Amino acid sequence: MQFIRSLLKGFQEDAPAGGCSLGDPAATWSRLLQGRCSIGTGTRIDAARLTVRNPHGCSLSIGADSNIEAAIVLEAQQAEVRIGSRCHLGGGTLVDAACKIEIGDDVLIAFEVLIMDHDSHALCFDRRRFDVRDWMKGTKDWTHVTRRPVRIGNKAWLGARAIVLKGVTIGEGSVIGAGSVVTCDVPAWTLVGGNPAKTIRPLTDEERESL
């Protein structure tokens, strides 16, 4: 297990390859977040990584019986990530929060999915001129970066390499096709796909029962 990497002046902690059960990452991750971390019973952290750029007010919670293989990044002060119970976050997935990302219960997220609640940089060049330098120091100014919470409802399923952008709410039971770019809200129990993602059709009653 590798403790704080200073290269990016953030705080990072890797879970060991092969996975670990409740308790193995919990103490270290809680220390990085100054106690604001909880991991539910039976949750498996499998080669996951937590990066905390600035720990002030940041928090992370993961429910019970989930499997986490993703990288989770808390970019700014007060950033929050909430992951429910019985969720799967696949390898190569990045959950990148500068505001708040909330993932409900029974959510399936395939590999290499990107979920972001921010634009990363300001559109105005003068306001992003020193972003890289300050980001490496953990002192990046997020004041002029657009941030809006992301919420993924219970029972949703996100296909491989989907991208979910800031301010999006994905409704309960919805299915996001592989490679889709989700830029606006998705109604509950809806199949969407494409770039940008568009409604393909509502899920049938039979499909809803299977979810």
Where is each model-derived feature located?
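Conserved loop-to-helix junction within protein kinase catalytic domains, corresponding to the end
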Residues: 125-127
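Conserved coupling/switch loop of ABC ATPases
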Residues: 166, 184
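A generic "structured core" feature
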Residues: 175, 180-181
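Adaptor protein-protein interaction modules in ubiquitin signaling
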Residues: 131, 138-139
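Domain-scale signature associated with acetyltransferase and cell-envelope carbohydrate enzymes
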Residues: 1-123, 134, 143-155, 162, ...
